[in-house]
């Protein structure tokens, strides 16, 4: 039996935790550089579309009294860890699926599972201020569906739905469109509806072998899961990522190569930290740059370069050298650049099989230096030690003009409580 605990409008809920005056005020959260909407509270959804550019909706926000915030990922990450820790304290095994979702193994848990779901919901809210929904079912896909129903009908469900009972499960399947099923995108929805598979129930009753032949094994597993056969296990340990990406919009348009190389060096440093954190090395790096998308008066340009590293590595010095050389090759003067991206590819574990018996490997001295770098930055803060090409305070850094305080991660911004 699986449970899915999903935070409600997570980013917006995080902003409300320390601003009780916004309890009934619609909220949107903006992407890096206050570019576009990436999160909306429930009461903001009728007025603002996901992904809407901020500069296009300022009048809408003002007209409907909607509060906007710059993204504060330090706050969101910290509150996410607190939510996950509470869930882990109440169930035997947890898979953290995303920053605001976790699957829980409820097999063999004593007592009523609906009551357990209510206890999880209550404790998370009491300890963090974050509202969550809980879906309980025999498979992961059904747990997703139960959670969706818990939120959609919250006034009737209290935010918890258990569909282990076949009759309840059948009702939910019949009253859920196929497009709302986990993993069914717009194109797949159109294909399935063309086959008269309109509801989740229709998909559960479809021939799984036919679905596999026409589409993929993924759709076959989805149908089997909806029918009650568990095909997806609980992954307690996150598998190493096969690609690692770091990209940001610049705080302002850049026209010179120097600042763009600084940005690429900075993003390479961030990506290499993630690479070393999972104990991996990479063989290739792809660097890309582009101009803005929304201004019709600006000349458009986008390009990328893929570089092969001399050997699989996680040494930020070597990676930065190759990444900055790559961006130098694709840079063209006369354009106003808005974004750069660094993508680490061909990720593997050190010492994995290679067909070249005499292939060069990363020197032990690099391993020791990178370990020391991560140890110092882990103790004294990110960026304490960095490569010389990474600036301390870049003038192209992210624009976050509406960011809330780091209430839980910075000593100088902690709340002060006075007792009288």
Regions inferred by a protein language model and the residue ranges of each:
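Residues that scaffold, gate, or flank divalent-cation-dependent active/transport sites
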Residues: 1-99, 103, 109, 226
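Short acidic, glycine/serine/threonine-rich loops at helix termini
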Residues: 14-16, 39-42, 142-150, 216, ...
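Short Gly/Ser/Thr- and Asp/Glu-enriched loop/turn motifs at secondary-structure junctions
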Residues: 97-101, 137-140, 280-284, 335-339
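Catalytic palm subdomain of template-directed nucleic-acid polymerases
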Residues: 104-121, 150, 196
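Long, highly charged, low-complexity intrinsically disordered interaction regions
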Residues: 116-179
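DNA-contacting surface of Y-family translesion DNA polymerases
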Residues: 180, 188-334
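Acidic, metal-coordinating catalytic segment for phosphate/diphosphate chemistry
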Residues: 309-420
